[in-house]
Curated annotation (Swiss-Prot):
Locations listed in the record: Cytoplasm
Keyword Cytoplasm belongs to the record: yes
GO molecular function, one term: LPPG:FO 2-phospho-L-lactate transferase activity
Organism of provenance: Streptococcus pyogenes serotype M3 (strain ATCC BAA-595 / MGAS315)
Keyword Cytoplasm: yes
GO cellular component, one term: cytoplasm
Keywords: Cytoplasm
Family membership: Belongs to the gluconeogenesis factor family.
Name of the protein in its database record: Putative gluconeogenesis factor
Length: 325
């Protein structure tokens, strides 16, 4: 039997936790990664060179490779604040930016680095051009730019994306639509709902592919609420927002952590964008999705509450075997 095909969609921090474990399984992986980041090193490089931001893609490259730890530290090395124009830039971002300039696009750069790192899966930016994320709040106010959205004190109604450097309609990267249509399973998240997952899904071609695919669509719900995005959200609220943006109820299965996060990890100063544990609304989830898998997916590490990638992937593999039958 052929390996199942799984496409994982989101931002570099959240989905990397899943990809690190998933790469060890007998599965054909495609990662589709957001290009809406406009803060920090990625924002500086995209503005200076008008390229798709490299940071999320850098993290996914590392998650899907089996390079020695030292090489990983080299790729992730961040220049010191005293290093002038290089200050704050991870070396990997500069490498991606350099190859992007040589080869004409970030898409081409990632394909070259995928081969260089002997990665067996596929990694695609969701779009081949940098995108600007726009958030429309329930009070009617609109904010442009991912890094600015969380700073506005309000509840987000919906988000959309535009091309940053031209007036053309945002388009999916080559092969992304094909990957979605050919997948046995689509995995959304984990990661920031409005600023990491949805920037990919609201690209019209990706939204339409998700409507057409016969794949099982799985959402890995966040463990913690997020400042400026999902304050006071339940897990069912997360799913409702996804379905709202997709235009219909497309989430087949939701994976939800039910392990209790210790109080010491709430409102952490170390991870100041995260607030408290997401409320579990089992009845609401059952109305919003066909299948709910509630289990202990929690890993406490370095002062933060994260998904245990191995436990999540174990459930995903069990599920994909069922849907492929």
């Amino acid at each position: 039997m052929k390996n199942p095909k799984m496409t994982v969609i989101g931002g570099g921090t959240g989905i990397s936790i899943i990809l690190k474990s998933l790469r060890n399984e007998a599965v054909d992986i495609t990662a589709v990664v957001t290009v809406a980041d406009d803060g920090g090193s990625s924002g500086e490089l995209r503005n200076a060179m008008q390229l798709a931001p490299p940071g999320d893609l850098r993290n996914v490259l590392l998650a899907m490779s089996d390079m020695p730890k030292f090489y990983e530290r080299v790729f992730q090395y961040r220049f010191n604040e005293s290093d002038g124009a290089l200050a704050g830039h991870p070396l990997g971002n500069l490498i991606i930016a350099g190859i992007s300039e040589m080869q004409g696009s970030t898409y081409n750069a990632i394909q070259i680095l995928t081969k260089f790192f002997h990665i067996t899966g596929k990694i695609y930016p969701s779009s081949e051009q940098a995108l600007t994320l726009h958030a429309v709040f329930k009070d009617g106010h609109e904010v442009a730019g991912e890094s600015s959205i969380a700073k506005y004190q309000g509840m987000i109604d919906h988000v959309y994306v535009t091309n940053t450097y031209n007036d053309q309609k945002p388009q999916a990267s080559r092969k992304v639509v094909e990957a979605i249509l050919e997948s046995d399973m689509i995995v959304l998240g984990p990661g920031s709902l409005f600023t990491s997952i949805l920037p990919n899904l609201v690209i019209p071609e990706i939204k339409e592919a998700l409507r057409q695919t016969k794949a099982e669509v799985v959402y890995i719900c966040n463990i913690m609420t997020q400042y400026g995005e999902t304050e006071q959200f339940s897990d069912a609220d997360h799913v409702a927002v996804l379905n709202q943006h997709l235009g219909r109820d497309l989430i087949d299965t939701v994976l939800v952590n039910v392990a209790k996060v210790p109080q010491a990890y709430m409102n952490s100063n170390k991870f100041d964008e995260y607030l408290v544990q997401v409320d579990h609304d089992f009845a609401g989830l059952c109305r919003a999705a066909k299948r709910v898998i509630s289990s202990y997916f929690l890993r406490l590490e370095n002062g933060g509450a994260f998904h245990d990638g191995n436990l999540v992937v174990e459930e995903l593999m069990n599920l994909v075997r069922i849907v492929k039958q």
